[in-house]
Amino acid sequence: AIDFETANGKRTSVCSVGVVIVKDGKIVNKIYRLIRPAPNYYTQWTTAIHGLTYDDTMEAEDFPDVWAEIKPLIDGLPLVAHNSPFDEGCLRAVHELYDMTYPNYKFYCTCRTSRKVFGKDLPNHQLHTVAERCGYNLENHHHALADAEACAQIALLIIPDPPKPKKAKKADKDTHVGDLFASLIPQQVKKNK
């Protein structure tokens, strides 16, 4: 599971990353790194969300150096995020900013899957709400590692055996995460559509 926090409204402004590596249903590694954001400024509203400031990341490494450490640890693994379009968008944006080749990581979304699995049984599908529903106590919400760990715990419960990543065929480009896990959705939720 992966989670990014950003310094401002730009997707390239990743200022921290949390990665939780799961193999055979067990958490085997946790990584948390601060990143010098690009552009390197913080807004009041982002700092209010995650608590990070310019001083926290002033001496942090740039994204390429941080990613050089993380990339070999996740090669070949699917990535799971809560609201994956945001995290995947950040990852693509910083790869483009630094002229790095993007390896077309396969992303799965616990938020989208939660909507399929829990439907209207939850008041919303925010990370802390879904984590609580799955019996996980999310402390320190909006800390990248805490959020990645909550996402991993959710995925272990609602995506117990995600499909192995495969190269997308032309017909697969319109496949959505929810479609991949349709067999996991309880019948009563399917009927509510």
Sequence positions of predicted segments:
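Conserved catalytic/binding loops enriched for acidic/polar residues
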Residues: 147
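Acidic two-metal-ion nuclease catalytic site recognized across multiple nuclease folds
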Residues: 133, 152-193
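Conserved non-catalytic scaffold segment of RNase H-like nuclease domains
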Residues: 1-104, 120-142
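Conserved beta-strand -> loop -> alpha-helix junction used to position metal-binding or nucleic-acid-contacting
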Residues: 103-114
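Buried hydrophobic packing segments
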Residues: 91, 113, 151-155
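Short, glycine/acidic-enriched loop or turn micro-motifs at the edges of active sites
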Residues: 4-8, 112, 150
